């Protein structure tokens, strides 16, 4: 009987040590956001609402980074559609996304830590934040879901 209990205790300790290591790795808030950033849909701010919505549907995404001359000028999300577009009599072919985007959004650098992204999201009420290089060229985006998944 003692051997059985010793074996069980040993197995429990091994499982606990594995779980602790997994949790420590999963909640490394100091990790750079480039470790969980994914690519982004980057479009000209002159793109029609129809094209943006079609791309959202086709690519199963809900966020576009908008540019002017290759530099970030805004962000447009599903939430912008709900709050600013739906219910208005608009010609989606003629309307430009720049009239409905969030101008000059908060941005992050790929080397910024996950904790910094989380702080910006909570303080600003953002669900998505563009990631740019040092010259404000979009290189990705991070969502609150990315952060939550990273935390475990």
For each feature predicted by the language model, list its residue ranges.
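Tandem CBS (Cystathionine beta-synthase) repeat/Bateman regulatory domains
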Residues: 1-152
């Amino acid at each position: 009987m003692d051997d059985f209990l010793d074996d069980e205790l040993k197995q429990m300790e091994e499982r606990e040590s594995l779980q602790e290591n997994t949790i420590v790795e999963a909640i490394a808030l100091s990790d750079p956001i480039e470790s969980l950033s994914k690519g982004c849909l980057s479009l000209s701010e002159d793109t029609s609402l129809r094209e943006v919505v079609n791309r959202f549907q086709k690519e199963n995404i809900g966020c576009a980074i908008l540019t002017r001359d290759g530099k970030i000028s805004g962000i447009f999300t599903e939430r912008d559609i709900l709050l600013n577009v739906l219910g208005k009599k608009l010609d989606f072919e003629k309307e430009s996304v720049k009239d409905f985007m969030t101008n000059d959004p908060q941005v992050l650098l790929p080397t910024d830590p996950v904790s910094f992204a989380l702080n910006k999201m909570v303080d600003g009420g953002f669900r998505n934040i563009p990631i740019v290089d040092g010259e404000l060229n979009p290189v990705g985006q991070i969502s609150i879901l990315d952060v939550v998944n990273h935390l475990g």
